[in-house]
Amino acid sequence: MIEKMKSKGNSTFWCLAGIFLTGALPLFTNYCLNSAEVPYQLVRIENMKDYLSAGIFQMAMPVNWQYEHGTAGLDGNLFWLLPVLLRMTGAALESVYRMFLICIYAVTVCFSYKTLEEGFQNKKTAVIGTALYCWAPWYLDALYGRAAIGEALGYAFLPVLLLFLVRAVGRKKGKLPQWLLLAIAISLLLQSSFAVLEVGMLLLVFCCVYYRRQLLEKDGWLTL
């Protein structure tokens, strides 16, 4: 029995690794650098690095910047500290950008699988759902085609909000209190993309209305 569980765990790991490697293929070529938005993202990293090197902790870019992006109003900048700090160690700018995309895609695979596995209680279904989510054309286009990194980050963290809904509707208890999980999910989306946050909030409101008996009655509040 234990050996069967180990073999299932190993097969799940390799399936997820295959999903990650397949979706990350553009990172091993110059395809991920062909988007018209990539220069904007590279200059964004370099600009934040210059500010930090000068001792200025500026988290948001000017709203009316030279690339005409409302970055400060639409995308968070907290997670950009990872490539910025790597850049400050002397790593090449393009390598830092690729590493950032690798981290985003890995987080997407892990969080989507965790949410689907708890929701369906079936590892095979969770693996298939993870592949569909991580290989979705709109997600790959945001990550590689349009280089909309804030949006891609939002889609990476959206499963955390879905995990809250899965546990709240099913009245399941996890290691974290439900209110804390919801707060973490909203905070992650706030620091990623305001557009994806709006999608998440609409989904949250819809579920609160549709599953109002499970979520809003006494037992539902106690679950939170």
PLM features: what roles do these ranges have?
Residues 9-13, 122-128, 175-179, 219-223:
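Membrane-interfacial loop-to-transmembrane alpha-helix junctions, especially the N-terminal start
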Residues 152-171, 203-204, 210:
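Specific aromatic-rich, kink-prone transmembrane helix
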Residues 23-119, 124-157, 188, 195:
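Active-site lumenal/periplasmic loops and adjacent helix-entry segments of GT-C-fold
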Residues 181, 189-197, 201:
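Active-site neighborhood of glycoside hydrolase catalytic domains
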Residues 199-224:
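Perimembrane helix-loop-helix junctions
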Residues 119-124, 169-173, 200, 213-214:
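Membrane-interfacial segments
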Residues 1-26:
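Start-transfer (signal-anchor) and selected internal transmembrane alpha helices
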Residues 164-188, 217-224:
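Short hydrophobic alpha-helices at membrane interfaces in multi-pass membrane enzymes
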